[in-house]
């Protein structure tokens, strides 16, 4: 939906209708927000052939005339000239072929439509956009800045690959469903030698396929004051990483913190991401900024914005509706000028910084510490402690290097349980542009220290796979958000842009992971943990409200503030395997029904094998992404089995009717609330691109992770025992409404998320384009 916010167009026009798309010629899934292509470096495979002989000719002439004027014999002249030239040319051919790539990856932003920040910049309005989704690579805006958000990958090219090192050999090894790496290790004389998984080698065709780093771990005892040993890092630029001599692996000023927002609460109004827009128009991402005490207060006190079937998938939605309140709620936190360090209160009344660690013994007691060495840096940590940022240098060859940053958390030393966060691009040396101007990401780092650049900054995947616990997750959430608050404060201190947009998604991430503590009948409910964490969602809203209050405190009467979300939330108790449903209802045929290998995100980003046992010639439909069904259409799909026209329409009607009538035999509920035909949801779409049917689930049901990746598990429905316990993806937008708040009165009965685009343009006196779908709010 954020693409629709940015352009005023429906997802059919922006082409961002899901996190995933598919290639009809190969049936292969891919990331929808951006695509990776290859760009030739110099002359590609001919570079060495062109450069070496060219230099050879010049060298030959230099040697020849040097010897000629020194009156050498003809034979000496000829042999020396040719010999020297051949030797140098041969060496150049070898060096260029070995150390200079023929191609390099380039990223293409797939979002279509001109954005609000491009239009504002064209009209001379200073604009700043912070961590907005689908801004990677960033747009070029004159006299403005963009820091890319959701869509920026980690150093492995994924949405966030964490690593988990353990001596417990009962743990699942290798790749988890959500893309984590589980590395089983063994102590040898209190030492472990292992690796940090780095970037895939997409520059050179020769091995290695991945550029990894050695990692050395050692148990040490009685380390006085448990001091950190940190040899100086090579500076990434003169003056160090933060403008000073860099002494460790991290920026000493790294703060804990608060990050992104956007979600909602079950029976309350929902939200997912909230933005602050200043217009000076400001949009700031929030989740339910205020907490009504009843459903009636929700209806009377907030504008509620709904999204259609694509909502919450990274695209906008067509049917989003808002029920406005004439006045901005008075409780938006004007009294708070300073923010508490932690967004969420810790269970038991203590801070969450420790990540759940037990109290540390006194200096006279025998304590075990973990010494971590990698990339020329050393840190010594207690159990329950986070490392500072480590700057990781991945060397492809002496001339090609890639820099990343990551943090360790020591969960346990014996047995070893060591978590390594996804490796972010270093903001001062990203391999691809993550800001506009390109130096803007580095400028921010100079002011606030190192920060996360990964689009999906809060690691929900590790908590979902139970490699970290809730307190570690909240600790990292605080760390993340505080940095983003610092970015916001940078603007509020100067207010040097007329249009400011920033996205906070921490409320979204928290609600995904903590909803299970609100429902005793949820398959993932844990009574003991619920006592600690049942209020975390509400605390995240309070923190977002505090952020909004801080913004309002700084605004004058002429500045307009918008706070909005792109979706709400519903419970996720059961996962629906739609490809399995298609198989059981004879719409998909398998060559081997026993082959139900689980798919992982590593398969997606690593270009693994998909659909290995599907008989496409006898398959009518297939499911992929977050509730999308594609018809195996002749002339569009590579092995199309369904004729366009009457057969196509009859099949869509049949699948729609059966899915909407389907009843869960276990409880009598309907998993599917509605199935939309694409023309009911989108306008101006590419029929080769957009799914033919969009499934909208009822509360409690969601498309399974396996269906999203093209998997075909055995069972139709599965209890969701994962920590990811609530969602908006594949839920019917009619029951998944978000919010829209403003300090400006609007006299409208309903609104659409696309309406914000033209409304802001009008406030900025910019002509509204004719080809958009949104309407100006009055």
Where are these predicted regions, by residue range?
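His/Asp/Glu-rich, glycine-adjacent segments
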Residues: 8-229, 248, 262-305, 340-341, ...
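Polar, surface-exposed loop/tail segments
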Residues: 138-141, 571, 575, 654, ...
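Glycine-biased, low-complexity coil/linker segments
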Residues: 235-240, 244, 256-261, 311-315, ...
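C-terminal substrate/ligand-recognition segments
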Residues: 492-493, 500, 682-711, 720-770, ...
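A solvent-exposed, charged loop/short amphipathic helix patch at secondary-structure junctions
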Residues: 516-535, 713-721
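Metal-dependent active-site segment of extracytoplasmic phospho-/sulfohydrolases and closely related
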Residues: 541-583, 587, 669-679, 684-686, ...
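Substrate-binding rim/cap in mid-to-C-terminal beta-strand-loop elements of soluble/periplasmic
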Residues: 578, 582-645, 722-764
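Acidic, glycine-rich loop-and-strand cores that form catalytic or ligand-binding grooves
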Residues: 641-720
